């Protein structure tokens, strides 16, 4: 399989240098003898990729998405050779490389450049389009019944929640949606504190949590217009949720939300009333649903 088939296409190549990769075998780090290339690039989704390529095959073998301040590239001082390590502070990943550039004098400068590119602020060329698409989606949600809205909010222990919510023949009521959000936040909606900053959209958009909704609520019909023709089955949706491009977009949205790089007013959200956390963002959506439901009742 070629790299273009296995990995996303890069929008911009920021840095490349020749380096082989190494593998950890017990307590020893063993070099891979192949000619390699380290590439720092920006993907179409706006995220920074740290890649390793086999130079002879011109194929990408390793592709790591790195967020600012998530990883450090540095020399392994315990080795007398030109060995470097990319280590992540978010988990226990440690990737080793050995320099193949002819001049060792340039290693320090390359190391500095790697860290500079990995830790620069993210840029999202399509952010305005993404925001517009999500805003349109929210507007459409306002016209639907609240069962469709609840289908996008997934929480632990959801099976029991869904069975309760769907026990009647009517649509999901606002109180049901509020109860789901209460379980998500670990307390009454509206009390979102700093402890909620650890919640990511990826934590709630998991296949094992989405499946009960696909089985109990009319979510598939709601999503079918956004999926390729003939790919709107529950299995297709679950496959999409696990695909690298989707997970990358979810991680990217979580990141720009947490760091305040997104304009909440584009979603009809007053930033003075909510925090830049996933939990607070969901709370804002719940408040929007509540307001729109009241307006609909007043009109009727």
UniProtKB/Swiss-Prot annotation:
Keywords: Cytoplasm, Nucleus, Proteasome. Disruption phenotype: No visible phenotype. Residues 192-295 form the DEUBAD domain. PROSITE patterns: DEUBAD (PS51916), PRU (PS51917). One of its GO terms (cellular component) is nucleus. Interacts with 'Lys-63'-linked polyubiquitin chains. Interacts with DSK2a. Belongs to the RPN13 family. This is 26S proteasome regulatory subunit RPN13. It comes from Arabidopsis thaliana.
């Amino acid at each position: 399989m070629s790299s273009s088939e296995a990995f996303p296409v890069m929008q911009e190549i920021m840095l490349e240098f020749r380096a082989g990769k190494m593998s950890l075998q017990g307590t020893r780090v063993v070099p891979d003898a192949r000619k390699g290339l380290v590439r720092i690039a920006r993907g179409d989704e706006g995220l920074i990729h740290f890649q390793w390529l086999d130079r002879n095959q011109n194929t990408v073998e390793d592709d790591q998405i790195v967020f600012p301040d998530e990883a450090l590239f540095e020399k392994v001082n315990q080795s007398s050779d030109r060995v470097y390590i990319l280590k992540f502070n978010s988990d226990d990943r440690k990737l080793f490389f050995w320099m193949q550039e002819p001049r060792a004098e340039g290693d320090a400068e390359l190391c500095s450049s790697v860290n500079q590119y990995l830790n620069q602020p993210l840029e999202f060329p399509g952010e305005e389009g993404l925001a517009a698409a999500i805003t349109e989606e929210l507007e459409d949600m306002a016209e639907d019944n609240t069962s469709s809205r609840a289908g996008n909010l997934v929480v632990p222990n959801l099976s029991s929640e869904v069975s309760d919510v769907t026990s009647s023949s009517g649509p999901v009521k606002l109180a049901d949606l509020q109860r789901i959000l209460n379980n998500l936040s670990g307390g009454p909606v509206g009390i979102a504190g700093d402890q909620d900053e650890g919640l990511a959209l990826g934590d709630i958009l998991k296949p094992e949590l989405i499946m009960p909704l696909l089985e109990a609520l009319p979510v598939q019909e709601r999503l079918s217009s956004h999926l390729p023709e003939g790919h709107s089955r529950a299995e297709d949706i679950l496959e999409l949720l696990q695909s690298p491009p989707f997970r990358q977009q979810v991680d990217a949205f979580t990141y720009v939300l947490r760091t305040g790089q997104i304009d909440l007013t584009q979603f009809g959200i007053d930033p003075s009333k909510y925090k830049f956390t996933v939990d607070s963002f969901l709370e804002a959506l719940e408040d929007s649903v509540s307001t729109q439901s009241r307006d609909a009742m007043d009109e009727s």
